[in-house]
């Protein structure tokens, strides 16, 4: 499973990139707001930091304006992935952009039927929002399993990009479901490496090593 960083903070992205953990980046209007920067500037910088897909979201809701905004975003870099909402206009724009061989990410997916339409529209990625589904009292991970089954049944090439990831358990369950990608906030991504038994075991080894009086380098 690939890891995308769900952030518009270039310092966080660079830190994770240096660790070799970044396969791509996703942004959205809320993350752009948090960055306090111009969208074109921040997306351009992110694209210079990572080689993988960088999702940049249109702000329009009608087809014509979506296409105009997509054209502006696509010019930023070759690794831009145009992010669109799963609406009828968004699906239409996705189909048109796919025919131009541009990468697309259909977002705000909350049902398997929406994911089916995303695949039919030729989306590169579909983004089911796991955490937000959990907030409604339904298991968001179940949606990942449903989409995986549908896509496998029909051989769709659209990749499942698990989004709205809140916890390390979400990441684990997304991996078990067969999701192709998980887009993860920096804090959660870094916490995947943490375990109290690892810390305890390392401390024991370091204490014993100190007693040997040896050096390796």
Curated annotation (Swiss-Prot):
GO terms for cellular component: cytoplasm. It catalyses: D-sedoheptulose 7-phosphate + D-glyceraldehyde 3-phosphate = D-erythrose 4-phosphate + beta-D-fructose 6-phosphate. Its EC number is 2.2.1.2. InterPro entries: Aldolase_TIM, TAL/FSA, Transaldolase_3B, Transaldolase_3B/F6P_aldolase, Transaldolase_AS, TSA/FSA_arc/bac. GO terms for molecular function: aldehyde-lyase activity; transaldolase activity. Its main location: cytoplasm. The keyword Ribosomal protein does not apply. Belongs to the transaldolase family. Type 3B subfamily. This is Probable transaldolase. It comes from Bartonella bacilliformis (strain ATCC 35685 / KC583 / Herrer 020/F12,63).
């Amino acid at each position: 499973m690939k890891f995308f960083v769900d952030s518009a903070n270039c310092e966080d992205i660079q830190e994770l990139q240096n660790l070799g953990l970044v396969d791509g980046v996703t942004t959205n209007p809320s993350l752009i707001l948090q960055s306090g920067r111009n969208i074109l500037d921040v997306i351009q910088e992110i694209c210079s930091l990572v080689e993988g897909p960088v999702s940049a979201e249109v702000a329009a809701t009608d087809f014509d304006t979506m296409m105009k905004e997509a054209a502006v975003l696509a010019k930023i870099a070759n690794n831009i992935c145009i992010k669109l909402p799963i609406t009828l206009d968004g699906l239409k724009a996705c189909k048109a952009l796919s025919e131009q061989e541009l990468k697309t990410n259909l977002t705000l997916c909350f049902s398997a039927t929406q994911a089916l339409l995303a695949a039919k529209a030729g989306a590169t990625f579909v983004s089911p929002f796991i955490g937000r589904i959990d907030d409604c009292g339904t298991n968001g991970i179940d949606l990942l399993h449903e989409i995986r089954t549908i896509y496998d049944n029909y051989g769709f090439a659209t990749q499942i990009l698990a989004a709205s990831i809140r916890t390390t358990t979400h990441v684990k369950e997304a991996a078990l479901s067969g999701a192709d990608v998980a887009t993860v906030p920096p804090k959660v991504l870094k916490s995947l490496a943490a375990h109290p038994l690892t810390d305890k075991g390392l401390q024991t080894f370091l204490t014993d090593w100190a007693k040997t009086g040896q050096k390796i380098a």
